A protein has these predicted regions:
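FabD-like malonyl-/acyl-CoA
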Residues: 1-75, 120, 205-237, 243, ...
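A short, acidic, amphipathic alpha-helical segment used as a generic capping/interface helix at domain edges
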Residues: 186-203
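Short Gly/Pro-enriched loop/turn and capping motifs at secondary-structure junctions
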Residues: 165-166, 188, 212-215
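Short glycine-rich catalytic loops that host catalytic nucleophiles or stabilize transition states
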Residues: 124-126, 199, 233-235
């Protein structure tokens, strides 16, 4: 959170401001904070509270996660429907969808993936995040957002929501910012759909902020057939490289 926010502020100091923002899972709070929905202090506090609530839920309802590779999303969804407690949770990019759910059912699910000519890679995580196992955490986080302790504002820069892959404040969607952000905890992250929507709307430069290049990796598959640029900022070196790529001296 802090590295990504610092990277965004560093770009802003050089005159680089986004036309839209999106964050993956926890990163959505960072995107909303930078966009003015929360102060920086509030953003940090929300990240901490969210983590505590999700950890409590994971301890109460243990879960497992696995990345499914080399299968269409629709086929993975169909496989999930054959299990009572396995759900698609992270739509990352074509050919990669993360699932989560009951640890007792996961081995058989992974065998079903392999039988369908896909690949299943168990993930070393402590819970079934973005599933109904997180319902109590989601409800508690909504209460925190609505009880008046935090100033919740509509973002000044457009932000795309993980739950809907649509903008916060979309007139076609009736959910408030607090409802969308809290519901994200127990619903899938629709990253692939967000990126596809941005590309369809004409966005052609994407800058990943924070440690690592995971989203950039997803982006390489998502921008195929598009004239689009993928950049990232995680330290001074990558900041300078990104500024150079943007023509900022």
């Amino acid at each position: 959170f802090t590295v990504a926010l610092a990277a965004a502020e560093a770009l802003k100091e050089q005159g680089i401001t986004p036309n839209a923002c999106a964050g993956f899972s926890l990163g959505e709070i960072c995107a909303l904070t930078f966009s003015g929905a929360f102060s920086q202090e509030e953003g940090i506090r929300l990240v901490c509270r969210r983590g505590e609530l999700m950890q409590e839920a994971a301890e109460k309802h243990p879960g497992a996660m696995a990345a499914v590779l080399k299968l269409p999303n629709e086929e993975v969804e169909k496989l999930c429907s054959s299990f009572s407690e396995i759900w698609p949770v992270n739509y990352n990019c074509p050919g990669q969808l993360v699932v989560a759910g009951n640890p007792a059912q996961m081995p058989d699910f992974c065998k079903a993936v392999e039988a369908a000519s896909g690949k299943a890679r168990p993930l070393a995580v402590g819970g079934g995040f973005h599933t109904p196992y997180m319902q109590e955490a989601s409800a508690a986080f909504l209460k925190i957002l609505e009880d008046g302790e935090f100033s919740v504002n509509l973002p000044e820069i457009p932000v795309y929501a993980n739950k809907t892959a649509r903008l916060y404040g979309d007139p076609d969607k009736k959910e408030t910012l607090a409802e969308l952000l809290s519901a994200q905890i127990q619903n899938p992250v629709r990253w692939q759909e967000i990126m596809e929507r941005l590309l369809a709307e004409g966005f052609d430069c994407f800058i990943e902020l924070g440690p690592g290049k995971t989203l950039t990796g997803f982006g390489k598959r998502l921008i195929k057939g598009h004239e689009a640029k993928l950049l990232h900022v995680e330290d001074e070196k990558s900041l300078n490289e990104t500024l150079a790529a943007l023509g900022v001296q």
